[in-house]
A protein has these predicted regions:
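A cross-kingdom feature that marks ATP-driven nucleic-acid transaction machinery
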Residues: 1-124
Length: 124
């Protein structure tokens, strides 16, 4: 498999991109004394990355290559997951984020509070 194959197979390219993003998140979380894990419940609801810090705070992250449809899908998934969290037993997430492969600027969606962040913005 070469670069041309990946360009023509966005599904596989997306999996590679997700893996690289999770690797970067692990580096950043480790620098803060935190960790990163994956979440999936028995009904198939999942979150690509959950960043946990030692103080008990955590964030939910979906990784998407980009595009309005995929960003909307990722944000919807995060909102659904947050609604299933029993905040009597654990804290609500500190943030929800869709990490994308495109874009120059990060922003917060006013309708649901989900941050949309291009991967390049994490370094700053």
């Amino acid at each position: 498999m070469g670069p041309d194959d990946l360009i023509n197979d966005l599904s596989t390219f997306g999996l590679f991109f997700e893996t690289l993003c999770v690797r970067d998140l692990r580096v950043y979380a480790d620098a803060l004394g935190g960790s990163v894990c994956h979440f999936r419940d028995r009904k198939g609801l999942e979150c690509d990355a959950v960043v946990h810090l030692r103080n008990g705070k955590y964030g939910l992250i979906e990784v998407k290559l980009g595009g309005d449809k995929l960003i909307e899908e990722g944000a919807g998934n995060l909102v659904t997951l947050e609604s299933k969290i029993d905040t009597d037993k654990m804290k609500a997430p500190s943030f929800k984020m869709v990490l994308t492969g495109v874009g120059k600027y990060a922003y917060q969606r006013p309708q649901d509070g989900v941050y949309v962040v291009p991967i390049g913005c994490l370094r700053d």
